[in-house]
Amino acid sequence: MGSSCLPPGFRFHPTDEELIGYYLSRKIEGLEIELEVIPVIDLYKFDPWELPGKSFLPNRDLEWFFFCPRDKKYANGSRTNRATKAGYWKATGKDRKITCKSSHVIAGYRKTLVFYEGRAPLGDRTNWFMHEYRLCDIDDHSQKSPNFKGAFALCRVVKKNELKKNSKSLKNKNEQDIGSCYSSLATSPCRDEASQIQSFKPSSTTNDSSSIWISPDFILDSSKDYPQIKEVASECFPNYHFPVTTANHHVEFPLQEMLVRS
């Protein structure tokens, strides 16, 4: 069956329990599967980037499903031979138990593998992952090394989205770069301003008439009354008392010492 035979809008998103309890179980027992969407291939004879072309399903979700014959690495052993032409699949972490929700019985196990390009053990890790599902005998589920049932394993091959991974790495790098710019006071853009604020000392508020400089434009006739000047001078020199001049009387005030009389 090819992808062209699938009904419009078809999506294949089975759960772990469905993959083992229905698809793998019926395949091993020789029972009919309602919709044959999982082909049988010798998965380890191909590199992962060759597998999408072998799938019956469209590759929009970047995951593909296959039934794979269990090829033992050693004639008298139980380990599977997972070497390909360009690299090898390496198991990571512990196998996960897949339990039937209805009976709470362990139906099988899921093993996670990562593809390394090159020869073991010096291969380069890639962004290809795989979940390998295996069916086990119900009577053997309590053993440390369960007796796996059948000649097939069901494999879900996944290609991680490299664009999202790179975008996340770039975002984290930018956040680290921004954070490092402000990690210390020495690199803070506010340091110079802070230094200026700390070094700034306000001038003394004590008015000393001997140290006050008067512009030549401010040299006036002390015998005349300048109300506009006195108003401005009162704001500039609040601690001084300015004269009150009437028509026949003139009162002296301290600021006259700074004025040149005509």
Swiss-Prot record:
UniProt entry tagged with the keyword Transmembrane: no
Keyword Transcription regulation assigned: yes
Protein's GO biological process: cell division; cellular response to auxin stimulus; response to wounding
GO terms assigned for molecular function: DNA-binding transcription factor activity; sequence-specific DNA binding
Pfam families from the UniProt entry: NAM
PANTHER family attached to this UniProt entry: (WILD MALAYSIAN BANANA) HYPOTHETICAL PROTEIN, PROTEIN CUP-SHAPED COTYLEDON 2-RELATED
Entry's localization field: Nucleus
DNA-binding region as annotated in the record: 107-166
One GO cellular component term: nucleus
Entry function: Transcription factor involved in tissue reunion of wounded inflorescence stems. Required for the division of pith cells in the reunion process, which is dependent on polar-transported auxin and the wound-inducible hormones ethylene and jasmonate. Binds to the promoters of XTH19 and XTH20 to induce their expression via auxin signaling. XTH19 and XTH20 are involved in cell proliferation in the tissue reunion process of incised stems. Involved in hypocotyl graft union formation. Required for the auxin- mediated promotion of vascular tissue proliferation during hypocotyl graft attachment.
Natural source organism: Arabidopsis thaliana (Mouse-ear cress)
Name this polypeptide is given: NAC domain-containing protein 71
Domain notes: The NAC domain includes a DNA binding domain and a dimerization domain.
Chief site of localization: nucleus
Ranges of residues in domain NAC: 6-160
Induction: Induced by wounding in the flowering stem.
Keywords tagged on the record: DNA-binding, Nucleus, Transcription, Transcription regulation
